[in-house]
Swiss-Prot record:
It is found in: Secreted, Extracellular space, Extracellular matrix. It comes from Mus musculus. Promotes matrix assembly and cell adhesiveness. This is Extracellular matrix protein 2. A motif (Cell attachment site) lies at residues 266-268. Residues 241-263 have a biased composition (Acidic residues). Residues 192-227 have a biased composition (Basic and acidic residues).
Length: 670
């Protein structure tokens, strides 16, 4: 019996709590509905105001007769309440047709004679209707509170009012009346709904309360026993409070979701994100004037520095000090940049005596060092062993001894162009420790022979603009990986090239001997050669079978600006290259006709014969008449010769797919 009474009492408390929560929830919903309805009612009131302003009473007019005996009838428009007098005639004698400005309009035809006017032909009568034209532009913008961007307000009604000659009532009065009516109607609805819900919610508690009064008399003797169950009651009370908190949190989440949905629907308004925009990092290093920081690079280009600026930035990996007036590098110049990987000190006035013995000691991760355009007379000592690229071009280097590059076993690129180096002041063991070197530039120096002791790992060797006269048999004995040799602008003669100088090189693919003293194409070329450049020599002959031993075969042969003539080339001159040659440059020579063998070069894509003395092109010199396949030629240059283009046979270029790839003009007239 005690448990039953206790259960009824707890149930009464729970129902009362649910009733209070439902009342609060109902008030919140009614408040939100009131806000939505007030805003929608305000918009409807504005629209009704616009319609009322544009509405005018039609004037009754009598039919009038026109000069062409047609009757003009003015009636009220069927499309709106606005009556507009029509100035269009009805076609006499044609029932159901209308005659408008010389045009016949069929029955039910609709047209617009002018903006904001629509006309209808109905059983021989012209019915016109003038509609409201909404302004295309936004005449007035407002910026709501708490928003970032302006929005367009209601369009002004002045243009419409002037059209109908009406004075609208004050906007403030209409707004106040509309708002009062909306609030009054909503309050009435809320009161009625509140009464209904209150009756439903209070019906059950009333019944329980009546039962409680009956049982109260029975419970009086048991008050003492009820106190024994107080701990149980408090425990359930705490559970109910926790449930209320969870339900309250759920309601708040629902409200937030509703607000998000409203924001998504109202997508024309921009809302600022609640997240904080990150500011400038506090760890940004202090930089001297005229310097900039980009990612991990500090750039101080042309900043008029006379010394290395003191910078402390452990996170920086690149430092550019190009184009300053720096003279010296003290021992502790880069102590604040321990993670530096690339250092550019080009175009300064740094001298060898101004570099401290421990200037680069703190740079344990330095990989690239550029010191072009300074006043160094020898390579700085104690360079980091991590260096992979070292550039000391355009200095005044006088010598390279055995220890200058001794610790740079990871060096891949070494550039020493534009100095005073020669075979006399460069020790034969200077490059011995460079085990990883693959790219070596020694151009614009004073070498007379190929430097001795080149690293075995060398792949590209640049020796242009020197005074080299001879290539001996032992020059490339230890460089079996070499793929490119550049020897242009030297003094090499074919008789001074040893037969075994490079014929056994298995990886050598490119040789540049331009602007030397060659009189014919050198013999004993490497078997692997693909690219041979002999521009600007005095070559007057291509010996037979000079390319015959090459595998897979020569692909690029450049012989421009030489002295080749018809007598210097025969059918066996290109033997071994007919199947492989892709580009052949024979321009600026002394040819008087197309060289023999051109039509047999099946892989040829680019042929230059311009600026010669060619006068005639025979049908089978470029295209073979016995073959039906098209030529692979894509570019053929024959300009600046003495060819009479009108006398060229129609079969001369029949194998070339595109005539636009043939250049014939201009020609010399003589």
């Amino acid at each position: 019996m005690k448990l039953a009474v206790l259960f009824c009492f707890i149930l009464l408390i729970v129902l009362q709590t649910d009733c209070e929560r439902g009342t609060r929830r109902q008030r919140r919903r009614m408040h939100q509905r009131r806000l939505r309805k007030s805003s929608s009612f305000h918009l409807r009131a504005n629209r009704q105001l616009e319609v009322q302003q544009t509405t005018a009473a039609p004037d009754a007019r009598l039919p009038t007769a026109n000069s062409d005996y047609s009757v003009e009838e003015n009636i009220e428009s069927l499309l709106s309440n606005l009556g507009v007098e029509s100035s269009y005639s009805v076609l006499p004698g044609k029932k159901g047709y209308c005659f408008v400005k010389g045009m016949i309009m069929y029955n039910k035809a609709v047209w617009s004679p002018e903006p904001c006017t629509t006309c209808l032909c109905s059983n021989g009568r012209v019915l016109c209707d003038e509609t409201e034209c909404h302004p295309k532009a936004c005449p007035y913008t407002i910026k709501p509170e708490g928003e970032c961007c302006p929005i367009c307000s209601d369009a002004e009604q002045e243009s419409i009012n002037k059209l109908h000659k009406q004075v609208p009532p004050p906007q403030m009065e209409m707004d106040q009346v509309a708002i009062k009516e909306a609030l009054q109607s909503e309050e009435d609805e809320e009161i009625a709904e509140g009464h209904k819900e209150h009756k439903k919610e209070t019906s059950v508690p009333t019944k329980i309360h009546g039962d409680g009064e009956r049982t109260e008399r029975k419970l009086r003797p048991e008050k003492e026993g009820r106190s024994a169950h107080q701990p149980l009651y408090h425990g359930r009370r705490e559970e109910e409070e926790s449930k209320e908190e969870t339900e309250r949190e759920g309601e708040e989440e629902e409200e937030e979701e509703e607000e998000e949905e409203e924001d998504a629907i109202r997508g024309d308004v921009f809302r600022m994100s609640s997240r904080v925009i990150p500011g400038t990092p506090r760890g940004r290093p202090r930089l001297p004037r005229s310097c900039s920081l980009s990612y991990r690079t500090i750039s101080c280009v042309h900043a008029d520095f006379t010394e290395i600026p003191p910078i402390t930035a452990p996170e920086v990996t690149n430092l550019e000090l190009v184009g300053n007036s720096i003279i010296s590098i003290p021992d502790e110049a880069f102590n604040g940049l321990p993670n530096l990987e690339r250092l550019d000190l080009s175009r300064n006035n740094i001298t060898s005596s101004g570099i401290g013995p421990k200037a680069f000691k703190s740079l344990k991760k330095l990989m690239r060092l550029n010191m072009d355009g300074n006043n160094l007379v020898h390579i700085p000592s104690d360079l980091p062993s991590t260096l992979e690229e070292l550039k000391i071009n355009d200095n005044n280097l006088q010598a390279i001894d055995e220890k200058s590059l001794s610790d740079l076993n990871q060096l891949v690129t070494l550039e020493l162009e534009g100095n005073n180096l020669s075979e006399i002041n460069v020790d034969p063991l200077a490059f011995q420790s460079l085990e990883s070197l693959s790219y070596l530039r020694l151009g614009r120096n004073k070498f007379r022979i190929i430097p001795q002791g080149l690293p075995a790992s060398t792949e590209e060797l640049y020796l242009e603009n020197n005074q080299i006269e001879e290539i001996t048999e032992i020059c490339f004995n230890h460089t079996r990986k070499i793929t490119m040799i550049i020897l242009r602008y030297n003094k090499i003669e074919e008789s001074r090239i040893a037969p075994l100088a490079w014929i056994n090189q298995e990886n050598l693919e490119s040789i540049d001997l331009s602007y030397n003293k060659l009189y014919h194409v050198p013999s004993y070329l490497p078997k692997s050669l693909l690219h041979l450049v002999l521009i600007g020599n005095q070559i007057d002959r291509i010996p037979g079978y000079v390319f015959g031993h090459m595998q897979p075969g020569l692909e690029y042969l450049y012989l421009s600006f030489n002295r080749l003539s018809d007598d210097g080339v025969d059918l066996v001159s290109f033997y071994g290259a007919y199947h492989s040659l892709r580009e052949l440059f024979l321009d600026h020579n002394d040819f008087k006709s197309i060289p023999p063998g051109i039509q047999d070069m099946k892989a040829l894509h680019f042929l230059r014969l311009n600026n010669n003395k060619i006068r005639n092109i025979h049908p089978e010199q470029i295209c073979n008449a016995e073959e039906d396949e098209d030529s692979a030629l894509e570019h053929l240059h024959l300009e600046n010769n003495y060819i009479r283009t009108r006398e060229i046979s129609s079969y001369a270029f029949s194998c070339i797919r595109l005539y636009s790839s043939i250049v014939l003009k201009p020609q010399h007239i003589k």
